[in-house]
Amino acid sequence: MAPQSNNSTTFVSKTQHYLKVKKPLLERQRRARMNKCLDTLKTLVAEFQGDDAILRMDKAEMLEAALVFMRKQVVKQQAPVSPLPMDSFKNGYMNAVSEISRVMACTPAMSVDVGKTVMTHLGVEFQRMLQADQVQTSVTTSTPRPLSPASSGYHSDNEDSQSAASPKPVEETMWRPW
């Protein structure tokens, strides 16, 4: 008689095969990618921070240090607020006034009266600019007027002829020292 063989073959389903072989392999690959990214992040933060102490930290400490570093960078980027054009102009005007004052003080033939007159004039003009800027700011914050009578919806031909007959004063332009 022939030896009896166990004809029962074990069938492995795809799910069982996945759980046994593929899942651990995919998990190792995922962890390898994460570790590679963490190492790259660690070197980048150490490079930008200029501190090699982060290279000796464990993963959790390194991630915390990276978060702190990124938050500092965001705060630094938000801090510099561009100055308003008028503020920039005021700063330039004051620099020009101080330069004029320095030059006049160093000029031996310059009389004191002329220097006082020039500096007084520059101060008066600066005050006038500040007042004009305050008026302009209050006008822009109030309700905007229509650009023309026609755009308001209450336009008549009589208003047009009256406004052409009476000339309006032209607004003075802002004096600039250059």
Curated annotation (Swiss-Prot):
Keywords: Developmental protein, Differentiation, DNA-binding, Neurogenesis, Nucleus, Repressor, Transcription, Transcription regulation. Its main location: nucleus. It is found in: Nucleus. Residues 169-178 have a biased composition (Basic and acidic residues). Residues 18-73 form the bHLH domain. Residues 135-165 have a biased composition (Polar residues). One of its GO terms (cellular component) is nucleus. One of its GO terms (molecular function) is RNA polymerase II cis-regulatory region sequence-specific DNA binding. Residues 135-178 are annotated as: Disordered. Residues 89-122 form the Orange domain. Pfam families: Hairy_orange, HLH. SMART domains: HLH (SM00353), ORANGE (SM00511). Participates in the control of cell fate choice by uncommitted neuroectodermal cells in the embryo. Transcriptional repressor. Binds DNA on N-box motifs: 5'-CACNAG-3'. The orange domain and the basic helix-loop-helix motif mediate repression of specific transcriptional activators, such as basic helix-loop-helix protein dimers. This is Enhancer of split m5 protein. The gene is E(spl)m5-HLH.
